[in-house]
Amino acid sequence: MNAHTLRFAYNKDMTLYDRDIREPLFQWLEEKYGMVRIIEEKQTGKARADAVMVTVDEVIGIEIKSDADTYARLENQVKYYDWYYDRNYVVVGTSHALHIEEHVPAWWGIITAEKEADGIDFYEMRKPQVNPKRKMKRKITLLWRPELVRIQKRNHLPAYKEKAKKFVQERILAKIPEEQLHREISRELFERDYTLIEAELEEYRQRK
Protein backbone atom coordinates (compact mmCIF):
# COMPACT_ATOMS: atom_id res chain seq x y z
CA MET A 1 0.00 0.00 0.00
CA ASN A 2 1.74 3.17 -1.17
CA ALA A 3 -1.10 5.66 -1.21
CA HIS A 4 -4.06 5.90 1.09
CA THR A 5 -6.52 8.61 2.11
CA LEU A 6 -7.45 8.92 5.77
CA ARG A 7 -10.36 11.04 6.95
CA PHE A 8 -9.71 13.24 9.96
CA ALA A 9 -10.85 16.68 11.07
CA TYR A 10 -8.33 19.38 10.19
CA ASN A 11 -8.12 23.10 9.42
CA LYS A 12 -10.15 24.13 6.39
CA ASP A 13 -7.47 25.97 4.39
CA MET A 14 -5.13 23.96 2.17
CA THR A 15 -2.07 24.33 4.41
CA LEU A 16 -1.14 21.16 6.28
CA TYR A 17 0.27 21.70 9.76
CA ASP A 18 2.14 19.21 11.95
CA ARG A 19 -0.96 18.71 14.12
CA ASP A 20 -2.99 17.79 11.01
CA ILE A 21 -0.50 15.17 9.86
CA ARG A 22 0.39 13.20 12.99
CA GLU A 23 -2.68 11.14 13.87
CA PRO A 24 -3.57 10.05 10.31
CA LEU A 25 0.12 9.43 9.55
CA PHE A 26 0.50 7.09 12.50
CA GLN A 27 -2.63 5.18 11.47
CA TRP A 28 -1.29 4.92 7.91
CA LEU A 29 2.03 3.56 9.16
CA GLU A 30 0.27 1.00 11.37
CA GLU A 31 -1.74 -0.20 8.39
CA LYS A 32 1.37 -0.36 6.22
CA TYR A 33 3.79 -2.02 8.67
CA GLY A 34 1.50 -4.08 10.87
CA MET A 35 2.64 -4.47 14.47
CA VAL A 36 4.42 -1.24 15.41
CA ARG A 37 4.70 1.12 18.34
CA ILE A 38 4.91 4.86 17.79
CA ILE A 39 6.81 6.94 20.36
CA GLU A 40 6.43 10.69 19.91
CA GLU A 41 8.97 13.44 20.67
CA LYS A 42 11.93 11.12 21.35
CA GLN A 43 15.15 12.83 22.39
CA THR A 44 17.78 11.93 19.79
CA GLY A 45 21.22 13.24 20.69
CA LYS A 46 20.91 17.04 20.63
CA ALA A 47 17.79 16.88 18.46
CA ARG A 48 14.29 15.60 19.12
CA ALA A 49 12.66 13.12 16.76
CA ASP A 50 9.06 13.98 15.92
CA ALA A 51 8.32 10.27 16.22
CA VAL A 52 10.05 6.91 16.39
CA MET A 53 8.41 3.79 14.97
CA VAL A 54 9.41 0.51 16.58
CA THR A 55 9.03 -2.69 14.55
CA VAL A 56 9.96 -6.23 15.55
CA ASP A 57 13.62 -5.71 14.69
CA GLU A 58 14.10 -2.06 13.71
CA VAL A 59 13.75 1.43 15.11
CA ILE A 60 12.72 3.95 12.44
CA GLY A 61 13.02 7.71 12.84
CA ILE A 62 10.26 9.97 11.51
CA GLU A 63 10.76 13.68 10.86
CA ILE A 64 7.70 15.73 9.87
CA LYS A 65 8.05 18.85 7.73
CA SER A 66 4.59 20.32 7.29
CA ASP A 67 3.73 23.06 4.82
CA ALA A 68 4.35 25.56 7.62
CA ASP A 69 7.89 24.29 8.39
CA THR A 70 11.23 25.26 6.86
CA TYR A 71 14.44 23.31 6.26
CA ALA A 72 16.39 25.49 8.71
CA ARG A 73 17.14 22.73 11.24
CA LEU A 74 16.89 19.69 8.96
CA GLU A 75 20.61 19.22 8.25
CA ASN A 76 21.37 18.99 11.97
CA GLN A 77 18.35 16.75 12.59
CA VAL A 78 19.42 14.36 9.83
CA LYS A 79 22.82 13.94 11.49
CA TYR A 80 21.33 12.82 14.79
CA TYR A 81 18.65 10.61 13.24
CA ASP A 82 21.39 8.81 11.32
CA TRP A 83 23.36 8.22 14.51
CA TYR A 84 20.58 6.25 16.18
CA TYR A 85 17.98 4.75 13.84
CA ASP A 86 18.02 1.79 11.48
CA ARG A 87 16.01 3.61 8.83
CA ASN A 88 14.54 7.10 8.58
CA TYR A 89 11.56 8.79 6.98
CA VAL A 90 10.85 12.42 6.28
CA VAL A 91 7.16 13.22 5.90
CA VAL A 92 6.40 16.41 3.97
CA GLY A 93 3.50 18.55 2.93
CA THR A 94 3.05 19.19 -0.78
CA SER A 95 4.89 22.52 -0.59
CA HIS A 96 8.11 20.56 0.09
CA ALA A 97 7.53 17.55 -2.18
CA LEU A 98 9.41 18.95 -5.18
CA HIS A 99 12.69 19.70 -3.37
CA ILE A 100 12.83 17.41 -0.33
CA GLU A 101 15.19 14.95 -2.08
CA GLU A 102 17.82 17.69 -2.10
CA HIS A 103 17.72 17.95 1.69
CA VAL A 104 17.92 14.34 2.94
CA PRO A 105 20.34 11.48 2.19
CA ALA A 106 19.53 8.99 -0.56
CA TRP A 107 18.81 6.25 2.01
CA TRP A 108 16.02 8.22 3.69
CA GLY A 109 12.44 7.34 2.85
CA ILE A 110 10.08 10.11 1.77
CA ILE A 111 6.33 10.25 2.42
CA THR A 112 4.19 13.06 1.03
CA ALA A 113 1.02 14.25 2.75
CA GLU A 114 -1.59 15.98 0.62
CA LYS A 115 -4.88 17.44 1.73
CA GLU A 116 -7.91 16.09 -0.10
CA ALA A 117 -11.55 17.11 0.21
CA ASP A 118 -12.31 14.18 2.52
CA GLY A 119 -9.01 13.60 4.32
CA ILE A 120 -5.25 13.42 3.95
CA ASP A 121 -3.59 11.35 1.24
CA PHE A 122 -0.22 9.76 2.04
CA TYR A 123 2.12 8.52 -0.67
CA GLU A 124 5.43 6.73 -0.18
CA MET A 125 7.54 8.64 -2.68
CA ARG A 126 10.71 6.75 -1.73
CA LYS A 127 11.21 3.68 0.44
CA PRO A 128 13.71 3.95 3.30
CA GLN A 129 16.92 1.96 2.97
CA VAL A 130 19.05 0.60 5.80
CA ASN A 131 20.94 3.54 7.27
CA PRO A 132 24.65 3.03 6.47
CA LYS A 133 25.64 5.36 9.33
CA ARG A 134 23.75 3.57 12.09
CA LYS A 135 25.84 2.51 15.07
CA MET A 136 24.69 -0.10 17.55
CA LYS A 137 26.72 1.63 20.27
CA ARG A 138 24.45 4.65 19.85
CA LYS A 139 21.23 2.73 19.31
CA ILE A 140 21.63 0.87 22.60
CA THR A 141 21.68 4.21 24.45
CA LEU A 142 17.97 4.52 23.63
CA LEU A 143 17.37 2.03 26.45
CA TRP A 144 17.07 2.78 30.16
CA ARG A 145 19.06 0.83 32.76
CA PRO A 146 16.15 -1.45 33.84
CA GLU A 147 15.68 -2.38 30.17
CA LEU A 148 19.36 -3.29 29.88
CA VAL A 149 19.00 -5.43 33.01
CA ARG A 150 16.17 -7.42 31.42
CA ILE A 151 18.29 -8.03 28.32
CA GLN A 152 21.15 -9.21 30.54
CA LYS A 153 18.85 -11.64 32.36
CA ARG A 154 17.32 -13.07 29.19
CA ASN A 155 20.79 -13.70 27.79
CA HIS A 156 22.31 -15.07 31.01
CA LEU A 157 24.85 -12.27 31.37
CA PRO A 158 26.35 -11.16 34.71
CA ALA A 159 24.39 -8.40 36.45
CA TYR A 160 27.29 -5.92 36.76
CA LYS A 161 25.27 -4.08 39.42
CA GLU A 162 28.20 -1.98 40.57
CA LYS A 163 29.26 -1.02 37.06
CA ALA A 164 28.33 2.14 35.16
CA LYS A 165 25.63 2.03 32.50
CA LYS A 166 28.22 2.53 29.74
CA PHE A 167 30.13 -0.55 30.91
CA VAL A 168 26.93 -2.63 30.80
CA GLN A 169 26.16 -1.37 27.30
CA GLU A 170 29.64 -2.38 26.14
CA ARG A 171 29.32 -5.88 27.62
CA ILE A 172 25.94 -6.40 25.95
CA LEU A 173 27.40 -5.23 22.63
CA ALA A 174 30.30 -7.65 23.03
CA LYS A 175 28.23 -10.69 24.04
CA ILE A 176 24.99 -10.54 22.03
CA PRO A 177 25.02 -10.92 18.21
CA GLU A 178 23.91 -7.74 16.46
CA GLU A 179 20.93 -9.30 14.68
CA GLN A 180 19.61 -10.61 18.00
CA LEU A 181 20.29 -7.32 19.76
CA HIS A 182 18.15 -5.43 17.25
CA ARG A 183 15.22 -7.64 18.31
CA GLU A 184 16.05 -7.24 22.00
CA ILE A 185 16.03 -3.45 21.74
CA SER A 186 12.73 -3.48 19.86
CA ARG A 187 11.20 -5.77 22.47
CA GLU A 188 12.11 -3.38 25.27
CA LEU A 189 10.82 -0.34 23.42
CA PHE A 190 7.57 -2.16 22.61
CA GLU A 191 7.07 -2.94 26.30
CA ARG A 192 8.23 0.42 27.70
CA ASP A 193 5.69 1.95 30.08
CA TYR A 194 6.41 5.61 30.68
CA THR A 195 4.03 5.65 33.66
CA LEU A 196 6.14 3.06 35.49
CA ILE A 197 9.70 4.05 34.64
CA GLU A 198 10.35 6.19 37.74
CA ALA A 199 9.28 3.29 39.96
CA GLU A 200 11.45 0.87 37.94
CA LEU A 201 14.48 3.13 38.22
CA GLU A 202 14.01 3.54 41.96
CA GLU A 203 13.62 -0.22 42.39
CA TYR A 204 16.84 -0.77 40.44
CA ARG A 205 18.73 1.76 42.60
CA GLN A 206 17.57 0.03 45.78
CA ARG A 207 18.76 -3.36 44.50
CA LYS A 208 22.28 -2.14 43.78
Stretches found by the model and what they are:
Residues 45, 68, 117:
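Residue-level detector of flexible, active-site-proximal loop/helix-junction positions
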